[in-house]
Amino acid sequence: PAVSEAFALNKWQIIEQKAATAMKLCCLITVPASVGMWVLAEPISLLLYGTAKAGVAIMHSAPAICLLGLQQVTTGMLQGMGHTNLPMLNMLIGIVAKLVAVCQLTNAEYGIAGAAWATNINFGVTALLNIIALYKFSIRFSWLSIAKIIAAAAVMGAVAVEAHVLLGGASPALATIAAMLAAGISYIVLLPLFGVLNRQELRQLPVVKRFLK
């Protein structure tokens, strides 16, 4: 809606600002979610299903969280700018890419991981085409900020793994939940350290602002 309003008023600077903010928020949420699910796939499987056998499916499905988020956010941007047909066309291309990937990857060699990556390819192709379209309309994103988010999420993932290993003697459920909490806390701490969020932006987060004076 914010992009649509700015587009109606022909305020391109505001459109670019809103688009950059939306992309940053999307990555702030979906990148650590994907990393966390990837590194804790087997413990999560054990926690939810009582077996680690679903860990492979969970791990290889993890990138879909981020890729789907990018697809949805960029689709909203294009629609807000009045280009309603482009996201649909890009989505159709993504579906075709998925069908090709399913034929190539869904076999005995790749197993369920192949099916998961076919879905990742679907979302990834659509998101990439949307981003290319946005660039053609002079919408730019701060890739440096996104790179910092990825770096913070990577460190967070390492913290999650280490925490789970250290708590390996506890019950699997307790170790997994504690690892998730440690990962979440470390990620929040890392964001300002990596220069992703400043103090003013942190104050806008309901959970964090109560700890900041």
Range-by-range predicted roles:
Residues K24-P32, P63-L67, A152-V159:
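Hydrophobic alpha-helical transmembrane segments of multipass membrane transporters and ion channels
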